From Swiss-Prot:
Lineage: Bacteria, Pseudomonadati, Pseudomonadota, Alphaproteobacteria, Hyphomicrobiales
Keywords assigned by UniProt, alphabetized: Ribonucleoprotein, Ribosomal protein
Protein name according to UniProt: Large ribosomal subunit protein bL19
GO biological process, alphabetically ordered: translation
Record bears the keyword Zinc: no
Keyword Disulfide bond (UniProt): no
Family per similarity comment: Belongs to the bacterial ribosomal protein bL19 family.
Taxonomic source organism: Rhodopseudomonas palustris (strain HaA2)
GO cellular component: cytosolic large ribosomal subunit
Molecular function GO terms recorded: structural constituent of ribosome
Transmembrane segments: none
Pfam families reported in the protein's UniProt record: Ribosomal_L19
Record InterPro entries: Ribosomal_bL19, Ribosomal_bL19_CS, Ribosomal_bL19_sf, Translation_prot_SH3-like_sf
Annotated function: This protein is located at the 30S-50S ribosomal subunit interface and may play a role in the structure and function of the aminoacyl-tRNA binding site.
Length: 131
């Protein structure tokens, strides 16, 4: 491991020490709680939308969230380890076959919906229901 990788690993561990970042990817609906500073006051603002892509890696990783606000599409890019992010919560998992969902920018209404990923039930529960 070279010097740059060692320094990035130290910074990554330092920044992600107090945070729990859930596993999520493109197509997942997430709620990002962002710290907003207005003058001397600071508050937490929830930003809910569909993750349309993740980029970068390690300390430079970021993700893009898209939502429709008052009929207008709004996209926001968040650095994953930003101190301005209070928490990230996954609301639902989306079933997609692409890493970047930029095609959603051109879709409106029902065509812009993403199918929810169905979770398989464990075999024991299915076998118990059959008896």
């Amino acid at each position: 491991m070279n010097l740059i990788q060692t320094l990035e690993k130290e910074q990554f561990d330092k920044l992600s020490a107090g945070k729990t970042i859930p596993e999520f990817g493109p197509g997942d609906t997430v709620i990002v709680n962002v710290k907003v500073v207005e003058g001397e006051r600071s508050r937490v603002q929830a930003y809910e939308g569909v993750c349309i892509g993740r980029s970068g890696g390690g300390i430079n990783e970021s993700f893009t969230v898209r939502k429709i606000s008052y009929g207008e599409g709004v996209e926001r890019v968040f650095p994953l380890l930003s101190p301005m992010i209070d928490s990230i919560k996954v609301v639902r998992r989306g079933k997609v076959r692409r890493a970047k969902l930029y095609y959603l920018r051109n879709l409106r209404g029902k065509s812009a919906r993403i199918v929810e990923k169905k979770q398989d039930r464990p075999a024991k529960v299915a076998a118990g229901a059959a008896e």
